[in-house]
């Protein structure tokens, strides 16, 4: 039923301007629509490939301890390097089942890195080698 539908990640943020700077300027997403005239909160939509990332102001911003959005890229090393040059900091993990090297973990054919937006929402960058 939904296999041909376009997917959208919806991310709560506390400050729409900071979110627009992070997702637009730092991550390089194209701002598609910004709504500052909504009665309860402001929101913005960014294009990412065939999908959409929506950020909206909410008191629930940054409360998830799990990944809220992920981006699949062809070359994770180049992407992480470019994002770092734009000021994005990547998480480092050193746990028995998850250890990053230069901010990137390799699990089978999956390579992934995680960063946080200004509210602490976790964003994943990933690529598959196989």
Label each PLM-derived region with a short phrase.
Residues 55-57, 67:
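Short, charge-rich, low-complexity interaction segments located
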Residues 2, 71, 81-130:
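Vicinal oxygen chelate
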Residues 18, 76-80:
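Short, conserved charged micro-motifs
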Residues 3-4, 10-53:
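Core segments of cupin and vicinal oxygen chelate
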Residues 1-20, 66-71, 126-130:
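N-terminal beta-strand motif that seeds the catalytic metal site of vicinal oxygen chelate
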């Amino acid at each position: 039923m939904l296999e041909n539908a376009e997917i959208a990640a919806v991310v709560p943020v506390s400050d729409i301007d900071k979110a627009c700077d992070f997702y637009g300027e730092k991550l390089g997403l194209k701002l598609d629509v910004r709504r500052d005239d909504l009665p309860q909160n402001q929101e913005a939509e960014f294009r990412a490939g065939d999908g959409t990332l929506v950020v909206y102001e909410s008191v629930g911003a940054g409360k998830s301890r799990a990944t809220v959005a992920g981006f699949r890229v062809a070359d994770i090393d180049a992407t992480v390097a470019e994002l770092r040059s734009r000021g994005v900091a990547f998480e480092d993990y050193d746990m028995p089942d998850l250890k990053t090297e230069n901010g990137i973990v390799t699990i089978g054919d999956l390579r992934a890195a995680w960063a946080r937006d200004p509210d602490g929402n976790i964003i994943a960058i990933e690529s598959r080698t196989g």
